[in-house]
Curated annotation (Swiss-Prot):
Major localization listed first in the record, in broad terms: cytoplasm
Function of the molecule: Specifically methylates the guanosine in position 1516 of 16S rRNA.
Record family assignment: Belongs to the methyltransferase superfamily. RsmJ family.
EC class (word): transferase
Protein name, as recorded: Ribosomal RNA small subunit methyltransferase J
EC number: 2.1.1.242
Record's subcellular location: Cytoplasm
Keywords noted in UniProt: Cytoplasm, Methyltransferase, rRNA processing, S-adenosyl-L-methionine, Transferase
Alphabetical list of SUPFAM superfamilies matching this protein: S-adenosyl-L-methionine-dependent methyltransferases (SSF53335)
Organism: Pseudomonas entomophila (strain L48)
InterPro entries xrefs: 16SrRNA_methylTrfase_J (IPR007536), SAM-dependent_MTases_sf (IPR029063)
Lineage of the species this protein comes from: Bacteria, Pseudomonadati, Pseudomonadota, Gammaproteobacteria, Pseudomonadales
One function term, GO molecular function aspect: rRNA (guanine-N2-)-methyltransferase activity
Any one cellular-component term (Gene Ontology): cytoplasm
Length: 260
């Protein structure tokens, strides 16, 4: 696929001189160079915060985490509230707002939806660059009057989700939500800008069975796995049932009933 032929080297750059110090700090923290003429991606620091820009003539626009405006705001205001499928999948009901661990946080979109509906969220992201975007987006959102209270319900952890779940200390999450990167083979899956940018960097979650196993061992009430609608279930324990939408479905693995 042409979209993946670009090099996967990454450099950090400031979009204006006043962001140079921040860019250098991120470069040091992420272990990335400030100059790399062969890089296929740039981590850019500017007025809109941190963003990742794929380089090259046909590259899509930059990817950043923005919980205040754009898609996240539209979904928060008009997405269907507690009636939307993800809410039903994790067990949101009258008087029930479960504690949820999103073990494959990505850019935090699903976690933000659940937090906006009142769930206490813990997020794990294993890819340091995506985790950095998420951290930056959460930090900017905390200063916003409308969404500041929502993101206060979102706690970000970094590292390997399987290892973190196996070594979990303290109260277990009631619900664990998984959305592993599925190995797509058709170009339609790469239409979304985020997919085009991150698939070469992140790859597919080939350890999905181990991820599910660790989640089932830790969750106190249920595990929910989001999959493309026609994708096979993850190898291992079979889900009890699924909720199916137009393009995706939620496989549900219950352990015990959620109560208010």
């Amino acid at each position: 696929m042409a979209e993946q032929e670009q090099g996967t080297g990454i450099r950090v750059e400031a979009l204006a001189p006043e962001f140079q110090a921040q860019a250098q700090a991120w470069a040091q923290r992420l272990g990335l160079p400030m100059t790399d003429d062969e890089a296929g991606f740039a981590v850019q620091v500017g007025v809109d915060g941190l963003q990742v820009q794929q380089l090259g003539p046909q590259a899509p626009g930059p990817v950043r985490v923005d919980f205040v405006e754009g898609q996240a705001a539209h979904r928060r205001l008009y997405g269907g509230g507690s009636g939307q499928m993800i809410a039903k999948a994790v067990g949101i009901a009258q008087g029930v707002r479960p504690q949820v661990l999103d073990a494959t946080a990505g850019l935090g979109k699903d976690a933000f939806v659940l937090a906006s509906l009142g769930c206490q969220m813990t997020l794990i992201e294993r890819q340091p660059l995506i985790a950095a975007l998420l951290e930056d987006g959460l930090a900017r959102a905390r200063g916003d009057l409308e969404v500041g209270g929502i993101v206060e319900r979102m706690r970000l952890l970094t590292g390997n989700a399987i290892e973190r779940m196996r070594a979990w200390e303290g109260e277990a999450p009631q619900v664990i939500y998984l959305d592993p990167m599925f190995p797509h083979r058709d170009k339609s899956a790469l239409v979304k800008k985020e997919m085009r940018v991150f698939r070469p960097l992140v790859g597919d979650d080939l350890d999905a069975p181990a991820l599910l196993e660790a989640a089932l061992a830790l969750a106190s009430h249920r595990v929910v796995v989001k999959r493309p609608r026609k994708a096979p279930i993850i190898e291992g324990v079979k889900p009890s049932h699924s909720l199916e939408g137009k393009s995706s479905r939620y496989d549900i693995y219950p352990k015990k009933a959620l109560k208010g």
